[in-house]
Curated annotation (Swiss-Prot):
Broad class of the protein's primary localization: secreted
Region listing for Disordered, in residue ranges: 39-120
Name of the protein described by the UniProt record: C1q-related factor
Highest taxon in the source lineage: Eukaryota
Swiss-Prot/TrEMBL keywords: Collagen, Secreted, Signal
InterPro entries registered for this protein in UniProt: C1q_dom, Cerebellin_Synaptic_Org, Collagen, Tumour_necrosis_fac-like_dom
Residue stretches in coiled coil: none
């Protein structure tokens, strides 16, 4: 069928005569004359030919018309994860955390190697230095406070030789001891009491039986508060004074402070 059309089209065009509106352009292309014929003759053909020539020299009109801009499309799906980035710099130090719970007790430690048992010098410096020792020079009798006026030691200056009393300045536990020589020869006895604030805390007795002299002695450990007084008082009899021989003595010292 295509072969028949190719053969017939040139025959029809050539038989149309001078009034025909078809020409063969090339071998197979056919262009219609858009202008009507003006009349017979060469003039009409010439005008149509000029118009056809002008029409064929211009570019064909575009059949594409630009429409309005469309709406934005839908958001696409997320792409695949990218590769890991470079390691960033260290961040600032955070605030301190809350205090944790106490941990479990640890296992017992290994036995120590042991030492010589010597007391460190720090122990000596922490104990207050309070101590005194005094002897009785002059004889006493009756119910007097014995005034041991021959003072040998008085660390801390807590003992007063004029009154025969020890006054506590540092509360703590103290040790006191006394020895009083009785002056006899008349068959009497002697009692010597250690008193704290006037109350008897220890007593001693010496009796004149077959000899003229005898000793009364005792010792105590007392807790003292600041201002407490400790002294030795006769409760009858005679106490012998030894000049500088210290036959009768009174002493004491602090064991430890409060």
């Amino acid at each position: 069928m295509l072969l028949v059309l190719v053969v017939l089209i040139p025959v029809l065009v050539s038989s149309g005569g001078p009034d025909g509106h078809y020409e063969m352009l090339g071998t197979c292309r056919m262009v219609c004359d858009p202008y009507p014929a003006r009349g017979p003759g060469a003039g009409a053909r010439s005008d149509g030919g000029d118009a056809l020539s002008e029409q064929s020299g211009a570019p064909p009109p575009s059949t594409l018309v630009q429409g309005p801009q469309g709406k934005p499309g839908r958001t696409g799906k997320p792409g695949p994860p990218g590769p890991p980035g470079d390691r960033g710099p260290p961040g600032p130090v955070g605030p301190p955390g809350e205090k944790g719970e106490p941990g479990k007790p640890g296992p017992p430690g290994l036995p120590g190697s042991g030492g010589s048992g010597a007391i460190s010098t720090a122990t000596y410096t922490t104990v207050p230095r309070v101590a005194f020792y005094a002897g009785l020079k002059n004889p006493h009798e009756g119910y007097e406070v014995l005034k041991f006026d021959d003072v040998v030691t008085n660390l801390g200056n807590n003992y007063d030789a004029a009154s025969g009393k020890f006054t506590c300045n540092i509360p703590g536990t103290y040790f006191f001891t006394y020895h009083v020589l009785m002056r006899g020869g008349d068959g009497t006895s002697m009692w010597a009491d250690l008193c704290k604030n006037g109350q008897v805390r220890a007593s001693a007795i010496a009796q004149d039986a077959d000899q003229n002299y005898d000793y009364a002695s005792n010792s105590v450990i007392l807790h003292l508060d600041a201002g407490d007084e400790v002294f030795i008082k006769l409760d009858g009899g005679k106490a012998h004074g030894g000049n500088s021989n210290k036959y009768s003595t009174f002493s004491g010292f602090i064991i430890y402070s409060d």
